[in-house]
Amino acid sequence: MNVKVEIASSTQVKNLHANVERILSIVPQEHLRGFTKIVFADLVAEPRLSAVQRASLPALYHPKMLGQMAWAEVALSVLAPKKKFPQSLLTRLSLKSSLAQVILSLVAQHYYMTLSKGIKKNQLETACRSYVEKHFERWREKEGGLRVRLLKPFKPQLDKLARKLATKYKEELDRKQISKK
């Protein structure tokens, strides 16, 4: 792996380096060309952002600048906040998948901003979102345990149900907006 992982956070996460390597193994190596490091810190240290944005921003991509290669920052205090046991249990259980989503989104930003041609700035967000969904699906199938293997035969029906519920939700929102006017 040619992406360096630096941990500069007071939050200790078990097997963080190994998890990052497994996540990056899903992505083709050509997409990581020029992406030098991922820094894990407590908060994103960007002076141009307000304190409120820094406290809630999970990650930030720094594109290639003069004399500096592309790199990324991940805020572990946003992904795994220090709370009492019952509140932090859910965030700890979903930390691996949240970490995968964040890292894949950073790689997608790097790929579409530096390596991919033909993507306009107004198409960047949708392209990154589809990239993350595609690679996250591959990661989940590779890393998923018993639950993923048990639910795989039912996935088409569950996806169909999710689409149907999403359309009903949109119709309901449209009806509410029309009734407000």
Model-inferred region functions:
Residues 122-138:
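An active-site-proximal "capping" alpha-helix that borders the catalytic cofactor pocket
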Residues 1-73, 90, 169-181:
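A metal-dependent hydrolase signature that marks the N-terminal structural subdomain at the beginning
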Residues 90, 113-122:
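Short helix/strand-bridging catalytic loops that position acidic/His residues to coordinate divalent metals
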Residues 82-89:
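Helix-hairpin-helix/helix-loop-helix acidic hairpins
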Residues 16, 96, 100, 124:
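Hydrophobic (often cysteine-bearing) scaffold residues that line and stabilize catalytic clefts
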Residues 97-114:
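Active-site recognition of the HExxH zinc-binding catalytic motif
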Residues 2-4, 14, 137-181:
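Long, well-structured alpha-helical subdomains associated
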